[in-house]
Amino acid sequence: MLNLIYNEWLKIFSRAGTWVMIGILGLTMVGFAFLANHFSAGESNSHWKQELQAQNAELKKEIKEDPSLKDGYKETITLNDYRIEHNIPSDTGYTVWSYVTDSANFTILTGLFTIIIAAGIVANEFNWGTIKLLMIRPLSRFQILMSKYITVLLFGLLLLLILFIGSTLLGLIFFGTGGETAANIHLIYKDGHVIEQNMMGHLATTYLSESVSALMVATMAFMLSAVFRNSSLAVGFSIFLLVAGTTATAFIAAKFDWAKYILFANVDLTQYVDGTPLIKGMTMTFSLVMLAIYFIIFLLLAFGIFMKRDIAN
């Protein structure tokens, strides 16, 4: 199995397109660093306490006029009070962590590139006629397909590491740490309480959570590639869902509770850490179960059909 994975890895990196994708990711990070360095405000705000106190006073005034706003404003007021009490500025200037946080948006690029690899890794074997050469080896079809899927996962992980480590290094070079302890703290509001998190740990979790959507769509692209033997179909359909899936699901969720069973209602796990679930009543456990169900269905279809297919035709 390890030799199969190694061979698949060599195949991927023998193509110029793979290096072009890595180059695009690197240039995007560097370009964004220059833009952020040019437009961002580097100085911290020395009047942050007064501004937070004024904001809280305004929010409490609005709550008094309209009590229905209380639940919506409670988190902001609690976080502001915690910052004031523990001397944790809300604005420490643009630091390495600010840049790494903003760079998390580029996980859509890592997802896109992983989908392209996933969509072609099986279909191209059929298109190029090399699938028959794989079949004459003393290996099971399951081993062959599993090695390809593991290679897709490893490639996606590599891109994620390049993005995370690269953005951290670029952030340190361009923006520094900010020189304040507060810049290394992330606050989370959960169940009426404020929790302090190490910024590095928070960002690592954020990057992994942001990649869940890409993982699921890449797995679907892999399934489509194995089932239909058409990389164009797999790429086009998967990219469309990656870009539009979450937005379309949000529209449906606004009207129907059954939207919680849709894949894209569950891929954003950060909604249970930093925000509010898309649909009331959804939990982290529920989303993980739904993701596991979709994941198993995609792989069962991919392996089930591939293992029964007549390769000669």
UniProtKB/Swiss-Prot annotation:
GO MF term (any one): ABC-type transporter activity
Cellular compartments annotated: Cell membrane
Primary localization: membrane
Tagged with keyword Cell membrane: yes
Transmembrane region(s): 16-36, 106-126, 155-175, 208-228, 233-253, 286-306
PANTHER family recorded: INTEGRAL MEMBRANE PROTEIN-RELATED, MEMBRANE PROTEIN
Protein name in UniProt: Uncharacterized protein YhcI
Gene this protein is translated from: yhcI
